[in-house]
Amino acid sequence: MTNIRKTHPLMKIINNAFIDLPTPSNISSWWNFGSLLGLCLIMQILTGLFLAMHYTPDTTTAFSSVTHICRDVNYGWVIRYLHANGASMFFICIYAHMGRGLYYGSHAFRETWNIGVILLFTTMATAFVGYVLPWGQMSFWGATVITNLLSAIPYIGTTLVEWIWGGFSVDKATLTRFFAFHFILPFIILALAAVHLLFLHETGSNNPTGIPSNMDKIPFHPYYTIKDILGVLLLILTLLMLTLFTPDLLGDPDNYTPANPLSTPAHIKPEWYFLFAYAILRSIPNKLGGVLALLFSILILALIPMLHTSKQRSMMFRPFSQFLFWVLVADLLTLTWIGGQPVEHPYVMVGQLASILYFFLILILMPVTSLIENKLMKW
């Protein structure tokens, strides 16, 4: 008799995706992040669901309801901080996953890569609207500043901003709709992730060498299920360490002050995972220019398959490209640091240089270096 997992319509899908999936035998731990992102998403949806049971999306009670969750709900503080720090873990995994894709040339799978870019945008939108919900000072002013950027759009900007706000300022209508968006978007992410996986399984996984591995495949289970469990344990350990020992390490103290439209915080800044983009935005003195730079700093990822000029897929055997890749990582870390600093000398200058380097590396240096490496191969 044939095994049920190979005949049952539902089990067959699970089997082909997670059990009998032919996988390259040489993929490293950098390939763990996909499954970790799935785990993060499920964890965020579950903790978010329990938080939504006690949260009230109203300007007068939102801040108090979060306090109530932390003080009065059984283990509410654990759920709240798991959710807040879970978002940080989510973005750490996203950036590692993207870095892996860039380094090993996973962008050759166009559809998978492009859906990944859409997933990134959706996740960033979810995190942004979620940060507004506790209705602290940074929530309120973050929402005001970021939504206000849309007013830089010529002709329709101001109307668009007021339409998003649902009034003439960030108020009750804004909070209610942001809660609605924050609830629905993770399920859209879930659907997109399924499509992401669907396209990936059309081609099969890439591997560190970037060379087709069809002649050397092993089943996903037990080899990679066991390997993924190690990543899962490390992720859970890190998340629990953060949540139970230093739950506010990555947060902003200003968000423990209830939102007050009459008093602006000294330094308005987003969560750490948006600081690199925020630094690029701030480094351009023109409002519209800054908004376009901010948008393009993420959209540039969609251009990466077109900017790939090397004859080799992976960077494994390309030392010059490897060097530039790590310069890019260092540059992004510099931008993240600058984004959290006040707008004053020397931070402004460092931010401008780092922003120029970011675009210069991706658009010019890396493609040109790849062409030079192609020439060197003929020597």
Curated annotation (Swiss-Prot):
InterPro entries: Cyt_b/b6_C, Cyt_b/b6_C_sf, Cyt_b/b6_N, Cytb/b6-like_sf, Cytochrome_b, Cytochrome_b_C_euk/bac, Cytochrome_b_N_euk/bac, Di-haem_cyt_TM. Signal peptide: none annotated. GO terms for cellular component: mitochondrial inner membrane; respiratory chain complex III. The keyword Calcium does not apply. A ubiquinone binds at residue 201. Component of the ubiquinol-cytochrome c reductase complex (complex III or cytochrome b-c1 complex) that is part of the mitochondrial respiratory chain. The b-c1 complex mediates electron transfer from ubiquinol to cytochrome c. Contributes to the generation of a proton gradient across the mitochondrial membrane that is then used for ATP synthesis. Belongs to the cytochrome b family. This is Cytochrome b. The lineage of its organism: Eukaryota, Metazoa, Chordata, Craniata, Vertebrata.
